[in-house]
């Protein structure tokens, strides 16, 4: 199992993406942050979590930013 702790803006959108495209993943923690975002922890198989991060969360980011966020995945 792997996990990642990330900030998001639209919880409902991310929740729907995970439910419909990545059913192996689950959101295990949700917290409002002070900075107009929501902090969530997503857990699941490493391959699925890596695919979610690359295809959904990091999509459209500069290579350096994407590399940073992909590095947040914990095994």
UniProtKB/Swiss-Prot annotation:
Lineage: superkingdom: Viruses
Pfam families: Phage_FRD3
Full protein name: Uncharacterized 8.8 kDa protein in frd-Gp32 intergenic region
Lineage start: Viruses, Duplodnaviria, Heunggongvirae, Uroviricota, Caudoviricetes
């Amino acid at each position: 199992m792997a996990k990642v702790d990330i900030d998001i803006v639209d919880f409902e959108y991310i929740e729907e993406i995970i439910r419909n495209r990545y059913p192996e993943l689950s959101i295990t923690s949700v917290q409002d942050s002070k900075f107009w975002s929501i902090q969530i922890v997503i857990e699941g198989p490493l391959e699925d979590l890596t695919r979610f991060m690359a295809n959904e969360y990091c999509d459209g980011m500069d290579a350096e930013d994407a590399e940073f966020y992909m590095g947040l995945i914990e095994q």
